């Protein structure tokens, strides 16, 4: 083999090449999000206002409280709280918060708001209106971590049957519709969608499944540990089966769209 070819390189070198694509997806998302946050600001996880008579008010939450966990899952951004509230479909949730340096937990039963079409607890978050570049970059990492977490939770819901495949899963047609809608609202909304899709694609591509980068990485890790090359026939068969399954899923999702 040519010494410069991919197959001639060491397993560790090939792993770094395989994972470079996903890494660049994350970099793209962070650059876009940092720019958006620096221009428009962002919402924090600290409470600014609590609506009277809402589940949050009944639970004793107060302005200034900082939400840190929802049902034990770490909160990176305020969207984690909204997603956590709605993923439970109205079931009671445990909110961990910090007040004056002390942490406490309350149990809240979200209320379904007909006009909004979703569950809410009745809180408004403080905003960072003129963040510094460093604050914007830090928040972009938080947002990226949040998107990674939400993507994994979404995949888990699909595989466990918790997600509604008719309404919660979309394919190319859905993405095109979302892109068109975001573009109509404004270029920055479209860029935010690009960042979200970039992270989602990176996470999906890193799954340890044949034909995906994650599947290749697993094979190369096996070669690295055993110091033996996995036979090309086995690799080819795995990738063919994986590719066919992915194409099948894509066709089904597109038909559903």
State the predicted function of each range.
Residues 58, 62, 68-69, 80-125:
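PDZ-domain C-terminal substructure recognizer with occasional recognition of PDZ-binding tails
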Residues 1-49, 239-248:
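Internal alpha-helical transmembrane segments
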Residues 18-27, 192-206:
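Pore domain of cation channels
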Residues 3-12, 110-203, 218-241:
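Functional transmembrane alpha-helices
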Residues 30, 34-69, 73-76, 130, ...:
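PDZ/PDZ-like domain segments forming the peptide/carboxylate-binding groove
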Residues 43, 168, 207-220:
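Juxtamembrane/interfacial segments flanking transmembrane helices
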Residues 21, 56, 64-67, 71, ...:
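Terminal peptide-recognition signature
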Residues 252-257:
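Juxtamembrane boundary at the C-terminal end of a transmembrane helix
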């Amino acid at each position: 083999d040519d010494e410069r070819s991919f197959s001639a390189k060491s397993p560790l070198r090939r792993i770094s090449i395989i994972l470079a694509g996903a890494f660049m997806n994350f970099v793209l998302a962070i650059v876009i999000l940092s720019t958006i946050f620096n221009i428009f600001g962002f919402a924090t996880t600290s409470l600014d206002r609590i609506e009277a008579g809402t589940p949050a008010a009944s639970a004793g939450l107060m302005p200034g409280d900082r939400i840190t966990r929802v049902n034990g899952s770490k909160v990176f951004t305020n969207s984690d709280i909204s997603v956590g509230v709605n993923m439970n479909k109205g079931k009671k949730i445990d909110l961990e918060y910090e007040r004056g340096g002390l942490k406490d937990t309350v149990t809240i039963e979200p209320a379904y708001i007909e006009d909004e079409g979703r569950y809410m607890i009745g809180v408004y978050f403080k905003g960072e209106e003129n963040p510094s570049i460093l604050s914007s970059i830090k928040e972009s990492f938080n947002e990226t971590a949040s998107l990674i977490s939400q993507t994994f939770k979404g995949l888990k819901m699909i595989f466990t049957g918790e997600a509604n495949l008719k309404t919660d899963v979309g394919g190319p047609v859905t993405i095109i519709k979302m892109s068109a809608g975001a573009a109509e609202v404004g270029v920055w909304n479209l860029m935010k969608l690009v960042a979200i899709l970039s992270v989602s694609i990176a996470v999906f591509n890193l799954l340890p499944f044949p034909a995906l980068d994650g599947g290749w990485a697993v094979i190369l890790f096996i070669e690295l540990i055993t110091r033996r090359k996995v036979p090309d026939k086995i690799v080819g068969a795995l990738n063919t089966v994986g590719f066919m399954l992915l194409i099948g899923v894509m066709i089904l999702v597109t038909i559903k769209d």
